[in-house]
Amino acid sequence: MKLIKSCILFFAFVILWSCSTEKNKVLNREFHNLHAKYNGFFNANEIIKVTYNDFLKTRKENYNSILPIFPLPSLEQSKNWYAPMDTAYRKCELVIFSHRMPHAKKGKNRNREWCKYIDDNWMTMGKARFYKKYLPNALKIFQYVENHYEIEDNYYESIFWQSKVLIEMGAFDEAEEILLSLIIKFEEQQLEAKDQEKLTVKQKLRLALIYKEIIDYLESKEPVISPNIINKIYPTLADLYIQSKSYKKAIENLEIAVENKYKKAFKTRLFFVLAQLYHLENNFKASLYYQEVVERNPDYEMAFQAKINRALSFSGRDYKAIKSQLLKMLKDDKNIEYFDQIYYALAEISFKNNAEELGK
């Protein structure tokens, strides 16, 4: 029996020793990658996702003001996030402590970190602090990723998230500078990529065969800004400009954003906010975008508000269609509590239409 116990202890010691963070072997890397991905990064992100979705389900939209592009908890509401965000944070913190494998070899393996999910865990810790409204701490974490993982995919993601933190802190000029610089950098990288495509076959063979040139080439490479980050920048810029009341700039960025691909609900939200901004400017495009929202079949309340606002933004176009839509809404029992809004909208379009007729 003692022999069996001794063997078990021996093999346990061998396994633990073989998975040391100091040993850079394939088995070690896979062991630490697996734990860093699922024990920290994946589980922590699931906690954040579930908490955010629960928040959205219980949240009530205020259609009397411009909708926030990215709904976030208020300072008071964020207190309900403390426990889940702390859990997510601790999971990632433990993973970083237990599984990071620092390394500084040059060439194609010149990563500062052999465990490829460590920077992802840092990013998740930053997001947990962001949603908890610990903004200075979140900013420091994203800055840490920028300074220590400059060759990883999360390098530019960390810079982007710094802008989101700065927006919530009210540092609009700093956030704007970051976001615009990312767009400029992306455009520069696109041009460089086109130049790389122009390399001759001889030059490509030279890069492939001469070791020193391979090393020099890899050392000179930098992380690429993904189109996914650029897609997130335009709604974020619009959010910044709305919060700073620069509505014309917000419209410009939303016009770009709605041309990109997003999940249906988020894109519908962008159309609604764009319609609201045009409505503020008494621009006929408001009516067009409210109709776009209706046609995208959103939830009942957003569809209702889009129909009402379309009528209120009426500028002499499609009078009959809008009136018909409002009269149809009066026949729906679900709208009983909103009848006052519908009658008000009918009166508004009738008044505007009569004014149009008199002006002819």
Where are these predicted regions, by residue range?
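Positively charged n-region of N-terminal signal peptides that target proteins for export
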Residues: M1-S6
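Bacterial N-terminal signal peptides
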Residues: C7-L16
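Acidic, polar-rich low-complexity tracts and alpha-helical solenoid repeat scaffolds
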Residues: C19-K360
